[in-house]
């Protein structure tokens, strides 16, 4: 096996283990939820479809982990997470694959500030365990995870890094025009908020 490919496999395994180690230590419970579902919700994606012969029922492969995890929260499990495969029957490019591993977590009695704290600490924990430090080389840059993460709204981020102010964009047509100007691909179904999200990904 090519050494670089081997290193990627080893590093991925360490990352998954480190995520589990951190979340378990924070009181989260790892769960498994159904892959075959009657209603594939939780994301805007086209599902793969199949047929269950024993019940003569059409089923779908899940496109996200969200809905069953939220049911567990409502049922009284206050901190849950899942690392599992999801399937999306759509485009194929550098950011889209028909099947991929997704991690989702949910916890009760917190807000988005608590979730940001959790995310920031998770990244630091994984980086420290997997690489032995908090300074990560990325191309010509070094990402320093020891510093507090910038906390900024999506609108402010696009304005700061792409010089586009979505507060000044009044309607969908104007948003589409801005997207075309910046070579951001979008679909007919995308609304202004979707184009804002695509703009953030683009930068």
Question: Which residue ranges define each predicted feature?
Answer:
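Class II aminoacyl-tRNA synthetase catalytic cores and aaRS-like
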Residues: 1-201
């Amino acid at each position: 096996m090519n050494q670089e490919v081997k290193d990627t496999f080893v590093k991925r395994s360490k990352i998954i283990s480190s995520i589990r180690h951190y979340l378990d230590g924070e009181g989260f419970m790892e769960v498994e939820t159904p892959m075959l579902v009657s209603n594939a919700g939780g994301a805007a994606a086209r599902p793969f479809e199949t047929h269950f012969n024993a019940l003569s029922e059409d089923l779908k492969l899940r496109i996200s982990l969200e809905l069953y995890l939220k049911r567990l929260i409502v049922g009284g499990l206050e901190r849950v997470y899942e690392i599992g495969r999801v399937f999306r029957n759509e485009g194929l490019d550098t950011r889209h694959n028909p099947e991929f591993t997704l991690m989702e977590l949910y916890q009760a009695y917190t807000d988005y500030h608590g979730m940001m704290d959790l995310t920031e600490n998770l990244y630091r924990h994984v980086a420290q365990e997997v690489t032995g430090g908090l300074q990560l080389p990325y191309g010509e840059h070094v990402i320093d995870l020891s510093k507090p993460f910038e906390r900024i709204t999506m609108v402010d981020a696009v304005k700061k890094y792409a010089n586009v102010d979505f507060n000044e964009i009044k309607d969908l047509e104007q948003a589409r025009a801005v997207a075309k100007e910046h070579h951001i691909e979008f679909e007919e179904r995308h609304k202004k908020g979707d184009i804002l999200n695509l703009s953030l990904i683009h930068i």
